[in-house]
Amino acid sequence: MKKLSNIFENHNNINITFGEEIQIEDKEAVMLPVIVNGVEMSTDDIKFSITPEYLDNKFYYRPDIFIKKELRGKGLGYNIYKAFIHEFGNVISPDAFRDNNVEIPKIYNRLAKEPDIVVERKPGGYYAYLKSQR
């Protein structure tokens, strides 16, 4: 078993995938297993769930993320959001549901620098989606 410190040796080379194939269809939150550099993370370390939302005649995915204090500052939140957008197409962070008004805007500011991702700050929250879904 790899030690957590070994998984995060290179902050610039973090590969995020999600566990088994997930169907996100209902309004219920779905917990996604997060795999970092080939190691499935314990839910004590990272919890990532998605709730589908129907807004403006489109489906969006609202993430809820928890990262253990010792693992913060390594780019995990950003990389998890980016991987999710590449796999599922979009995320939203409504102001009403956001618990962290410091880190979440930082994630969206970094996502806005990705050439294939569009980030919009609309009344009510942040939206991020693949340019190909415009």
Please provide the spans of the model-predicted regions.
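Acetyl-CoA-dependent GNAT
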Residues: 16-58
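Conserved acetyl-CoA-binding loop-helix of GNAT-fold acetyltransferases
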Residues: 67, 73-86
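Residue-level detector of alpha-helical secondary structure
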Residues: 5-8, 82-85, 105, 109-112
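Conserved active-site alpha-helix within GNAT-family acetyltransferase domains
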Residues: 92-126
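Polar, enzyme-active/binding microenvironments
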Residues: 43, 85-90
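Proteolytic processing junctions in secreted/extracellular precursors
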Residues: 3-11, 20
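Conserved acetyl-CoA binding element of GNAT-fold acetyltransferases
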Residues: 57-69
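Preference for well-ordered, secondary-structure-rich cores of eukaryotic proteins
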Residues: 32, 38, 44, 79, ...
